[in-house]
Amino acid sequence: MKRPSSHGRRPPQGPSQRQLRAGELVRHALVEIFREEEINDPVLAGVSVTVTEVRVSPDLRHATVFVEPLGGEHADEVVQALNRHARFLRGHLGRAIELRFTPELKFLHDESFNEAARMAKLFDDPKVRQDLTPQPPSDSWKDED
């Protein structure tokens, strides 16, 4: 009996080692660019931006950059400003890294910090905490003589 054909497709996989290395290379370079270059935008003036992760496409031509503004305030405005200056940042990135193609940059707000804070608050809820604490075993199943 024949196995069902997957029509030449492999099952979905995570990023390759090449993508992971390129993502880290781009992340480190962007951190240096943010530290050294002045971006003329009133929204970005005086704002420190943390680059938390960079995900690179399999062909290394596109990079999604996850950022978190220090303090988490005005995150949407900061992300919009970074996307407006993506070409400027890509130009500096091309001079800072050695890849065949400099990836196009798309900036997104990293929601993982907010999600972690929400989960921590949820676990501190007394109703949830009572379900998380171990209960002493019940002796009701034992026969009493």
Curated annotation (Swiss-Prot):
Pfam families attached to this UniProt entry: RBFA (PF02033)
Give the primary localization class: cytoplasm
Q: Which UniProt keywords apply?
A: Cytoplasm, Ribosome biogenesis
Q: Which SUPFAM superfamilies match?
A: Ribosome-binding factor A, RbfA (SSF89919)
Ranges for the region named Disordered are 1-21, 124-145
Q: Which PROSITE patterns match?
A: RBFA
**Where is it located?**
Cytoplasm
Domain of life of the source: Bacteria
Give the GO terms filed under biological process for this record.
Answer: maturation of SSU-rRNA
Name one molecular function that GO assigns to this entry.
ribosomal small subunit binding
Q: Which family does it belong to?
A: Belongs to the RbfA family.
Function of this protein? One of several proteins that assist in the late maturation steps of the functional core of the 30S ribosomal subunit. Associates with free 30S ribosomal subunits (but not with 30S subunits that are part of 70S ribosomes or polysomes). Required for efficient processing of 16S rRNA. May interact with the 5'-terminal helix region of 16S rRNA.
**Assembly, per entry:** Monomer. Binds 30S ribosomal subunits, but not 50S ribosomal subunits or 70S ribosomes.
PANTHER family recorded: RIBOSOME-BINDING FACTOR A, CHLOROPLASTIC-RELATED (PTHR33515:SF1)
Q: What is this protein called?
A: Ribosome-binding factor A
